[in-house]
Regions:
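Juxtamembrane membrane-water interface segments immediately following transmembrane helices
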Residues: 32-59, 203-259, 263
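Membrane-interface alpha helices of multi-pass inner-membrane proteins
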Residues: 121-122, 126, 165-179, 189-191, ...
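Transmembrane-helix signature of polytopic, membrane-embedded enzymes
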Residues: 15, 89, 103-127, 145-146, ...
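Lumenal/periplasmic acceptor-binding loop at the mouth of the active site in multi-pass
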Residues: 250-329
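Extracytoplasmic catalytic/substrate-binding loops of multi-pass membrane glycan-assembly enzymes
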Residues: 35-48, 57-58, 63-78, 84-88, ...
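Short helix- or helix-capping micro-motifs
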Residues: 22-28, 118-129, 133, 146, ...
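Transmembrane-helix motifs of polytopic, lipid-linked glycan transferases
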Residues: 92-112, 150, 326-333
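Loop-to-helix entry region of an early transmembrane alpha helix in multi-pass inner-membrane enzymes
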Residues: 70, 74, 82-100, 134, ...
Length: 401
């Protein structure tokens, strides 16, 4: 893998341009991080990491937790050893990871789609405003996206070179554990790349290697089967906040002071079931609204909708990538002769991932921009049929290398 990257650096002018752009952006972002400085935004993952660093275990304020899967808090635990400055150190590491993600998206795209589209895809990824900023946030998306891209590159590279498939399998399952909503999508991609009969045992064993230790820990700690993370009823509850009674809200806020997240699931469940049974039409309507939030802008940011930051980071990317996705779907349906069967199946899987993730958030909650960012880069890859479908762009796109 390293030699493959170095070989392309030596031989490909386009790859070097992306690399130098990445180095420039990395330098600017690190100067801003440590020079201005930009204060990193941290949520629960960081506080779990602090407890790990302090030797008190995988905990939050109310004791043991399964609110977050272990990959990202463990990633943060080493920076957490150096106190609050560790936030800056962790952000610096994340900026390096996103620099390498830009290189890997070029490499994977060049294998699958050709080097010229790879140049465009990696350029759009590197300059995507939300992705430029997001490594300043200590939240699992900052690790999920680089891991997902690394998995894709390793899967493409191992298929091209007929290499050992276990490492990309492990990275794929690790990505799914980092962001469990991606598990069905990762499974679909694992089967796409490694679905032959001879790989079935390896797929199962590598999944067990990644998920079993965490599942055993949760069984021993909570006496419950939790292979990923605890919040299920909580996510439904958060999406129903506008409809629950004030008494129910007060009860939940009180319970949160002394219950851990696994215990709280029992408190959320009857509230959610009551909403389903008494206000199902309202729930359906709000689910449709959350779907539009996912694909446009969450309600909590509506009062900032026309500020330059939101226009540049969300409105324009969502609009342009949304139009691109619509056109690409039309081309996949109507211009199948421009795509190989393998590429067609790959792109359909990506569309399926986008649809699945948007439906899950629509059914639960879609209050944060970051929910979309785990998968928004897939829309960049889905621009390929546009390049392939129009004669001039197809000529620019070039051939596979």
């Amino acid at each position: 893998m390293i030699f493959d990257v170095l070989k392309d650096w030596k031989e490909s002018k386009q790859f070097r341009l992306i690399g130098w752009l990445g180095i420039l952006l990395l330098t600017i972002k690190l100067v801003m991080l440590f020079g201005i400085p930009i204060i990193p935004h941290a949520i629960e993952d960081w506080y779990i990491a602090k407890h790990i660093a302090e030797g008190s275990g995988y905990n939050l304020s109310n004791g043991s937790t399964a609110l977050k899967t272990p990959v990202y808090p463990l990633f943060l635990s080493l920076p957490a050893f150096i106190g609050d400055f560790g936030k800056f150190f962790a952000c610096g590491l994340q900026h390096f990871l996103w620099f390498f993600a830009t290189l890997f998206i070029y490499k994977a795209s060049s294998i699958r789609f050709g080097s010229r589209f790879a140049f465009v895809a990696s350029l759009l990824f590197a300059l995507h405003p939300a992705y430029v900023y997001y490594p300043y946030v200590l939240e699992s998306t900052a690790l999920t996206v680089p891991l997902f891209i690394l998995f894709w590159y390793l899967a493409e590279y191992s298929k091209l070179e007929s290499l050992n498939t276990k490492i990309p399998m492990l990275i794929g399952w690790l990505t799914a554990l980092t962001q469990p909503i991606l598990l069905p999508g990762i499974l679909a991609l694992q089967l796409f790349y490694f679905g032959k009969k001879r790989n079935v045992i390896s797929l199962i064993l590598t999944a067990l290697v990644i998920f079993t230790p965490w599942t055993i820990r949760n069984a021993m700690t909570f006496d419950a089967f939790i292979p990923t993370k605890s919040p299920m009823w909580m996510n439904f509850y958060e999406g129903m906040q506008k409809d629950v009674t004030s008494q129910e809200q007060t009860h939940i806020e009180s319970a949160r002071r002394y219950m851990n997240d696994v215990e709280l699931e029992k408190e959320y469940k009857p509230i959610v079931i009551r909403q389903f049974s008494e206000k199902f039409t309202t729930y359906v309507n709000r689910s449709f609204h959350r779907f539009t939030e996912f694909w446009s802008l969450p309600d909590r940011y509506r009062n900032q909708m026309w500020t330059p930051a939101i226009i540049v980071s969300r409105i324009l990317p969502q609009l342009l990538l949304g139009i691109g996705l619509f056109l690409s779907i039309l081309m996949i349906i109507n211009m199948s002769n421009h795509l190989s069967i393998d590429d067609r199946h790959f792109l359909i899987i990506l569309i399926g991932i986008l649809i699945y993730v948007s439906i899950i958030y629509s059914l639960t909650q879609a209050a944060n921009i970051r929910f979309k960012l785990d998968v928004e880069w897939l829309q960049i890859l889905l621009l390929f049929p546009i390049f392939q479908g129009f004669p001039k762009l197809a000529g620019f796109q070039g051939t596979r290398e």
